Amino acid sequence: MGTSSTDSQQAGHRRCSTSNTSAENLTCLSLPGSPGKTAPLPGPAQAGAGQPLPKGCAAVKAEVGIPAPHTSQEVRIHIRRLLSWAAPGACGLRSTPCALPQALPQARPCPGRWFFPGCSLPTGGAQTILSLWTWRHFLNWALQQREENSGRARRVPPVPRTAPVSKGEGSHPPQNSNGEKVKTITPDVGLHQSLTSDPTVAVLRAKRAPEAHPPRSCSGSLTARVCHMGVCQGQGDTEDGRMTLMG
């Protein structure tokens, strides 16, 4: 007897939910097509088609500045921030578009705060659901996030610190209004964080700032729907403190 795509997806999700027992409780979704490859954004008839895309991993590195493993099948997302490519196996190998509305899971409380963009469906959900049609779309989004973070950091002017300077240090140190000699120190504001990756695991990581809100259950905050073009969409709380991409 054959197995329907819905049954296969649900089986894959059960394997995912039972195989990840970390505090984050990964929520897994497949990426349609072959990760590490790019293509123009699709029209409605192409969205979520699950077909291989034309370019290879070199395009990933050119666009995002990071290498992508050839065997990757999933991408980790945490509150709209790219975390890593995940090697296939942890969440199964799935590329079936989610064109079946009846495959939506029942809403229930869940601790999961991770999300794999793509077209199969989550078991427990996450606080942020992203609409990502293709790998190209994902790369453009990730690059935009990196540029926004860099631009936001550059707009923070360095604040000089002053400290007394002992006699004989420097020829003509600056003086304050009281005539006291001071030296100026420009602090490191952390603007030069490289984006690197392990060949198989982490590519980009999200850094939670001290002011970020503590993790919350996504009970009641997950709203997900599936359109017939295979695009998983939803909306949730995206305010989670200031987050930056770092290596």
From Swiss-Prot:
One biological-process term from Gene Ontology? cell population proliferation
Q: Where in the cell is it found?
A: Cytoplasm; Nucleus
Which residues lie within the region annotated Disordered? 1-52, 147-183
Predominant localisation class: cytoplasm
Q: Does the keyword Nucleus apply?
A: yes
How this protein is processed and modified after translation, per its record?
A: Phosphorylated. N-glycosylated.
The UniProt entry's GO CC annotations, sorted and at most eight, read: cytoplasm; nucleoplasm; nucleus
**Cytoplasm keyword on record:** yes
Composition bias of kind Polar residues appears in: 1-28
Q: What is this protein called?
A: Cementoblastoma-derived protein 1
Source organism (scientific name): Homo sapiens
Gene of this entry: CEMP1
